[in-house]
């Protein structure tokens, strides 16, 4: 039984793809017109899609007419990849390929010496690789320096013009004490209600040149006596007539120059501090590299000085001087009172400043008005401000005595 002729013609009909349907024929150039072709586009036309090198012994697929090197496409078919690497058309075997000597002749016409072309390509690749590596290294270094400078500018805030290298850790904006006269004025101002009589005793070493924390607290201790706090007032004298930066242990190296200043409000913990004990709000301005331990030690020293000043202010002229009224006009009664002071009540010892430690007080922060968080003593104020606060107003901290200082 024979197949009808129309059925045979239908099976041989070539089905055009959408791309082929929209193709338009190009007119052949018959004159001597020359067209400039860039080496990059020419190389892409003469390149094997498998090895990305110039075609060698060109083989063309019979169905999709894509060109490959003979070794490349044969190796691909032997590995079991029975499809065109470019368009995924099915390739049964080597019988689906045909040689393309015309394309090899075209390549030979453009590049007569293939060995010279390959040597030139190797030299170009080596030079490009070397220049690219150097340029990448220099650009990476420049980018790193630029990023470091940007982060440094964001983190370091320049201090105000005319400010001291170490900020005063006393409250307010008062002038530092300049000598004994200033210390006496502060002491007299802090105790306006005291009865006239002998001037209150001043601790030794409170002269104009005293700047140590242990013995030079007399000029500043009186500023916090009674209910009025020197930290919240305008009489902002500093310890020992000098300035009080972050306290540091004896023998420690001097602190670096501050990159910026931080203002903070120091309040007693509303839950852990009993009312009336020392419910003073302190306004402190210090450097950003001061740590939480510095604040704790400053607070312990400050409160010890306040208690010492209160005891000195309320203390009489002598332990037993008020008990004798038989003294002569030359003030001998005072000496008898002192001599007989053993019979009166024993005077309480003044608080010592030698045992002051940063472990006596714990610093807390309540970010966003939430729960209180205990701050680690090694954290700097700049890090606390960036990590917990993140608002453009003075840093607010709370303090409370440590339950079990060690």
Curated annotation (Swiss-Prot):
Gene: Ring1
Region (Disordered): 151-263, 309-354
Mapped zinc finger ranges (RING-type): 48-88
EC number of this enzyme: 2.3.2.27
Entry-linked InterPro entries: RAWUL (IPR032443), RING1/RING2 (IPR043540), RING1_RING-HC (IPR042741), Znf_RING (IPR001841), Znf_RING/FYVE/PHD (IPR013083), Znf_RING_CS (IPR017907)
Protein name: E3 ubiquitin-protein ligase RING1
Pathway listed: Protein modification; protein ubiquitination
Domain of life: Eukaryota
Motif (Nuclear localization signal): 201-204
Subunit structure as annotated in this protein's UniProt entry: Component of chromatin-associated Polycomb (PcG) complexes. Part of the E2F6.com-1 complex in G0 phase composed of E2F6, MGA, MAX, TFDP1, CBX3, BAT8, EUHMTASE1, RING1, RNF2/RING2 MBLR, L3MBTL2 and YAF2. Interacts with CBX2 and PCGF6. Component of a PRC1-like complex. Component of repressive BCOR complex containing Polycomb group subcomplex at least composed of RYBP, PCGF1, BCOR and RNF2/RING2. Interacts with PHC2, PCGF2, RNF2; CBX6, CBX7 and CBX8. Interacts with BMI1. Interacts with MN1. Interacts with USP26.
CDD domains recorded: RAWUL_RING1 (cd17166), RING-HC_RING1 (cd16739)
Biased segments, Acidic residues type: 175-187
SMART domains per UniProt: RING
UniProt source species: Mus musculus
Job description of the protein: Constitutes one of the E3 ubiquitin-protein ligases that mediate monoubiquitination of 'Lys-119' of histone H2A, thereby playing a central role in histone code and gene regulation. H2A 'Lys-119' ubiquitination gives a specific tag for epigenetic transcriptional repression and participates in X chromosome inactivation of female mammals. Essential component of a Polycomb group (PcG) multiprotein PRC1-like complex, a complex class required to maintain the transcriptionally repressive state of many genes, including Hox genes, throughout development.
Region of interest called Necessary for transcriptional repression, as start-end residue ranges on this chain: 30-234
């Amino acid at each position: 039984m024979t197949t009808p002729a129309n059925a045979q013609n239908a099976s041989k009909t070539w089905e055009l793809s959408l791309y082929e349907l929209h193709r338009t024929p190009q007119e052949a150039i018959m004159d001597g017109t020359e067209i400039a072709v860039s080496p990059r586009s020419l190389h892409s036309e003469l390149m094997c899609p498998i090895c990305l090198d110039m075609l060698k012994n060109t083989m063309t697929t019979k169905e999709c007419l894509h060109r490959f090197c003979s070794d490349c496409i044969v190796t691909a078919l032997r590995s079991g990849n029975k499809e065109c690497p470019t368009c995924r058309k099915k390739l049964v075997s080597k019988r689906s390929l045909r040689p393309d000597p015309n394309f090899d002749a075209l390549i030979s016409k453009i590049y007569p010496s293939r060995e010279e072309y390959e040597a030139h390509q190797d030299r170009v690749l080596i030079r490009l690789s070397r220049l690219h590596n150097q340029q990448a290294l220099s650009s990476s270094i420049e980018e790193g320096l630029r990023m470091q400078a940007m982060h440094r500018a964001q983190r370091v805030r320049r201090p105000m013009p005319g400010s001291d290298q170490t900020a005063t850790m006393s409250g307010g904006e008062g002038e530092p004490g300049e000598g004994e006269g200033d210390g006496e004025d502060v002491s007299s101002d802090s105790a306006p209600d005291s009865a006239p009589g002998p001037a209150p005793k001043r601790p030794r070493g409170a002269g104009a040149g005293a700047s140590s924390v242990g013995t030079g607290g007399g000029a500043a201790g009186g500023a916090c006596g009674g209910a009025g706090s020197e930290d919240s007032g305008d009489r902002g004298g500093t310890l020992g007539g000098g300035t009080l930066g972050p306290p540091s242990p004896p023998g420690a190296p001097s602190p670096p120059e501050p990159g910026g200043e931080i203002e903070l409000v120091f309040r007693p913990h509303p839950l852990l501090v009993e009312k009336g004990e020392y419910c003073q709000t302190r306004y402190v301005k210090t450097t950003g590299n001061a740590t939480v331990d510095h604040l704790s030690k400053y607070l312990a020293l400050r409160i010890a000085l306040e208690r010492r000043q209160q005891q000195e202010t309320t203390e009489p002229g002598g332990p037993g001087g008020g008990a004798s009224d038989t003294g002569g006009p030359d003030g001998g009664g005072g000496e008898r009172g002192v001599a007989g002071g053993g019979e009166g009540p024993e005077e309480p010892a003044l608080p010592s400043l030698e045992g002051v430690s940063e472990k006596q007080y714990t610093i807390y922060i309540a970010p966003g008005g939430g729960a209180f968080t205990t701050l680690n003593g090694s954290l700097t104020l700049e890090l606390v401000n960036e990590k917990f606060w993140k608002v453009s107003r003075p840093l607010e901290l709370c303090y409370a005595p440590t339950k079990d200082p060690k």
